[in-house]
């Protein structure tokens, strides 16, 4: 249990969770990797001095710089995108670069194969509870002007303890030939909205409708359009208990299974696809 710095009063809440008075309902705001030093952001990190660094004193704090070559591919956007590329057979993503461990637990060398299960301990959005929940994707309505969408989800407490759950809605945007030509960066999945339920007694349900701003699906084109763009193609919404679960649900709706390298079979009924014609 990670508690940060709760203070003296906050420890009452910690005790309530530990002794079962209340069920935990928090979720991770980042991915927990087995070795974050192998992520692109850390591999690109360095102390690169300016050629005229000697003209400045160290206290000026301007004698070196960083190149953020990883772009948007930090945190879960890196791990989930690389995983999806492996399942979809894109770009040799299974190569050993950035690999932490082989399946047998040994540290990988040149012949290692990148495996999501060996790299990620807890995905983004992961959380624990003393009870269990089941969610259904009831309805998705895309506004005629393509500016907003409504996603309706029902959450049911299927366990024996009262508790809260979060409705997490993720999105996937099409990765087009145009995107490849102009090096536009897109994550295989991105959190698009979320909301927590009220405390649900065992057997109780709650239906939540999330209002989604579709402008958040845009990507920045720095090489050609010099602005944010929305590509024509197939878009996906998915509900999941975390980023990886939601991505697996999207991949399942695309016909992928563990036979294609998925860590687990997804639930296609928790995914919704729709077309954007531009």
What are these regions (language model features)?
Residues 1-149, 154-164, 229-240, 246-249, ...:
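Secreted, periplasmic, or luminal enzymes acting at the cell surface/secretory milieu
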Residues 169-173:
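Conserved aromatic beta-strand anchor motif in extracellular beta-sandwich/beta-rich domains
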Residues 158-160, 174-176, 215-217, 244:
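Short coil/turn motifs at secondary-structure junctions
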Residues 167, 177-222:
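Intrinsically disordered, low-complexity Pro/Gly/Ser/Thr-rich segments with frequent PxxP/GP/PP motifs
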Residues 216-236:
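Short glycine/proline/serine/threonine-rich loop/turn segments at secondary-structure transition edges
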């Amino acid at each position: 249990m990670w508690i940060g710095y709760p203070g003296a009063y906050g420890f009452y809440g910690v005790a309530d969770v530990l002794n079962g008075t209340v069920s935990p309902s928090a979720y991770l705001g980042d991915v927990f990797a087995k070795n974050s030093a192998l992520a692109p952001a850390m591999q690109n990190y360095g102390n690169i001095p300016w050629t005229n660094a000697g003209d400045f004193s160290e206290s000026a704090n301007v004698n070196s710089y960083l190149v953020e070559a990883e772009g948007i591919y930090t945190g879960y956007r890196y791990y989930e995108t690389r995983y999806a590329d492996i399942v979809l057979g894109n770009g040799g993503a299974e190569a050993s670069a950035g690999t932490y461990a082989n399946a047998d637990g040994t540290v990988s060398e040149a012949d290692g194969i990148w495996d999501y299960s060996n790299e990620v301990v807890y995905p983004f959005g992961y959380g624990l509870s003393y009870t269990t929940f089941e969610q259904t994707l009831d309805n998705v309505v895309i506004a005629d002007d393509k500016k907003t969408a409504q996603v309706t989800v029902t959450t049911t407490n299927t366990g024996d303890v009262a508790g809260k759950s979060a409705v997490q809605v993720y999105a996937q945007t099409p990765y087009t030939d145009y995107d490849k030509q102009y090096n536009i960066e897109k994550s295989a999945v991105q959190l698009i909205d979320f909301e927590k339920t009220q405390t649900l007694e065992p057997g109780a349900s709650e239906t939540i409708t999330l209002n989604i701003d579709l402008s958040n699906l845009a990507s920045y084109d720095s090489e050609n359009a010099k602005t944010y763009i929305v590509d024509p193609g197939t878009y996906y919404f998915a509900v999941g208990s975390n980023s990886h679960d939601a991505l697996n649900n999207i991949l399942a709706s695309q016909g992928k299974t563990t036979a294609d390298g998925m860590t687990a079979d997804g639930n296609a009924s928790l995914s919704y696809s729709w077309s954007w014609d531009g």
